[in-house]
Amino acid sequence: MADWKETLLTEAAAGCKNTAALKETLKAMAAHPSLSPDNVLLLRMQMPNATAVGGYKAWTEWYRRTLPRDVKPVVLLKPTVGVGKDAYITEDAEQNAVSNKSVEFATTCIGYAPVHLYDISQTIPDDGSEDVKDQYPLTLDDIVTGFRSLMDCDIATVSETGKLAYYNAEKNTLELATENKSLIAEAAICGLTRFEAERRLPDTNKLYVGLVAECAANVLLRINAIEPSNDILFFAAWNGAEGKNPEQYLELLNQIYWTSRRAMTRLRYAANQPVSFDFDEVCLLNQLMTSNNKERLMEQLRELVKHTEVPVLIEAANNLCEKLDMFDDAKVRQIYEDRCNRKILTQPIYII
């Protein structure tokens, strides 16, 4: 997939051409929450009805399913750790070039590489086939409990003057004029994605922050089997009459993805529920986790970030560091054992 960059930009523009198209893209992101927007767009282009994708060995060895010889794989992108070369000009103490020859040396770097994956619909179950893990959606109570733990907020009963459930950030209070648990959970998720969007984009205009937050909430609600009651309100104003360029659309989808995934990770952790690893994070674990030394692995990830210009890969490495930092030594040992036992493969989802 030599022209994957152009393909992604074309698909991003099509997926954000108007509010209706954006909603469909958000649904696709919610259906494949472990995939980055890059891979969601590529998957939707090749196999729009896919439900769970995994590698050949994941299906045949772990899930004990058969893949027919003539089945056609989907081609996605995976992070690949390799060796590149950095070039530097020799300088004196005043940083003036003193040599016209650059000094080259090898350095560990990270980039994208194509990978062949297959949807579960292309496999044939055998006797003793393993079930594919689902996304473990949080319950409505889990969402509210996790949100209150994260925000350390109060709950207040208010008169019905506007929204039936709303997180008041200024008062740090979940204001309720209803007992409908679904609406309360939705208010909690909207409050959390707004908090995460503002944290990610502190110097950005409020319209864009609001758009990222409402779209991230839409994805997060769908992941947890809650039908959003709110529409996407900010897109038309942000998009304008003439629209944006494809790079801006792809950046928007990335910001939505990063905001929703961090909110989900923090919410699951606060609610005492298993944390899931994204596809890019699993690929990095497979390549880098050669021991159960958490600090060593995190240092490797931080070093990799210095040697890539791909924002999605930078985020994947940073997010993996953040998740590892949540776990105690026993949990890290379990991840390492799973990796050694080939349980961490290019699976549809890895949860611990």
Task: Show which residues each predicted segment covers.
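Amphipathic alpha-helical repeat scaffolds
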Residues: L285-M289, R302, N318
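Generic structural signal for well-ordered, non-membrane alpha-helices
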Residues: C190, W258, R296-E299, E315
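Charged, low-complexity interaction regions
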Residues: T290-R296, V305-E315, D325-V332
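N-terminal accessory/interface modules of nucleic-acid-binding and processing proteins
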Residues: M1-L284, I349-I352
